[in-house]
Amino acid sequence: MKPPILIIIMSTVILGTMIVMTSSHWMLTWIGFEMNMLAIIPILMKKFNPRAMEASTKYFLTQATASMLLMMGIIINLLHSGQWTVSNNLNPTSSILMTTALAMKLGLAPFHFWVPEVTQGISLSSGMILLTWQKIAPLSVLYQISPTINPNLLLPMAILSVLIGGWGGLNQTQLRKIMAYSSITHMGWMTAILLYNPTMMFLNLIIYITMTLSTFMLFMINSATTTLSLSQTWNKAPLITSLILTLMLSLGGLPPLSGFIPKWMIIQELTKNEMIILPTFLAITALLNLYFYMRLTYTTALTMFPSTNNMKMKWQFENTKKMIFLPPLIITSTMLLPLTPMISILD
């Protein structure tokens, strides 16, 4: 893809998300979603092979269905209230339709089936955009309508997402699918806290985006797409491989890394709201994610795959590509836990 075209498309993706986040009119919100969806499809098809085309088609069909449900909810709310203003006094029927539509856009269970398939069929850079930037717009609308969301609809979705995100990643060897199931799990944690402390959801989102961006950038540097290819990078670029493993443990929520912060604060907030069963279940199912990240860490760092070369390290390491934003992203992805007491605005 030529640079001028890529700049125009990326600008449209960013503009669509910004329109959704800043608009107070439901029609503008819907237009922002459509701009974002139509602009992201050429980015998903950047590789232009049958797998990428299939993934883009699946993404388009899912997002188009979600947009249709969203528009239906907007129209029902218009007929009920007589206004287009984005507010938190929605009609119950339109609230259910909008919540379902936004859950489809986010990839929450049981509407999660498209996320691993689409992520696996596209390039690492496209997958990075899909699993980070594309989550911002639906979550911002969920934040705006959170007072009217039915807990009996959203909480089962959150619990199912955490459970399926953990189970689905257990037998995966493809790194993109592992990241997709990790995304489903994190979306489940965010929607679980949405009804009790919406601001904490954005803290979780910021940390999740930081960790996912760092991990995908390191995958791109190593050109690693499977567990096998990742394990073979240890003797080429040991520093980068060790950083990937640290980031994966952070994504799994292992203390004392940054990924533990949102889990810790969400469990604390749910306990304050006299919810005992939900945080207990979330903490237990989080072990599924931590298990497959620990297993990936073990196979990559603590075992040596069969090789024709008996040398444990190459005499000259590969000259890897430089990424300017990578060092600060890695630092924030792994070392934020001591700063947790400073986050007093959420109390």
Curated annotation (Swiss-Prot):
One of its GO terms (cellular component) is mitochondrial inner membrane. It catalyses: a ubiquinone + NADH + 5 H(+)(in) = a ubiquinol + NAD(+) + 4 H(+)(out). The chain crosses the membrane at residues 3-23, 25-45, 59-79, 96-116, 122-142, 149-169, 178-198, 201-221, 237-257, 274-294, 323-343. Pfam families: NADH_dehy_S2_C, Proton_antipo_M. Keywords: Electron transport, Membrane, Mitochondrion, Mitochondrion inner membrane, NAD, Respiratory chain, Translocase, Transmembrane, Transmembrane helix, Transport, Ubiquinone. Core subunit of respiratory chain NADH dehydrogenase (Complex I) which is composed of 45 different subunits. Interacts with TMEM242. Its EC number is 7.1.1.2. Belongs to the complex I subunit 2 family. One of its GO terms (molecular function) is NADH dehydrogenase (ubiquinone) activity. The keyword DNA damage does not apply. It comes from Civettictis civetta (African civet). This is NADH-ubiquinone oxidoreductase chain 2. Core subunit of the mitochondrial membrane respiratory chain NADH dehydrogenase (Complex I) which catalyzes electron transfer from NADH through the respiratory chain, using ubiquinone as an electron acceptor. Essential for the catalytic activity and assembly of complex I. Signal peptide: none annotated. PANTHER family: NADH-UBIQUINONE OXIDOREDUCTASE CHAIN 2 (PTHR46552:SF1). It is found in: Mitochondrion inner membrane. It is a multi-pass membrane protein. The gene is MT-ND2. One of its GO terms (biological process) is mitochondrial respiratory chain complex I assembly.
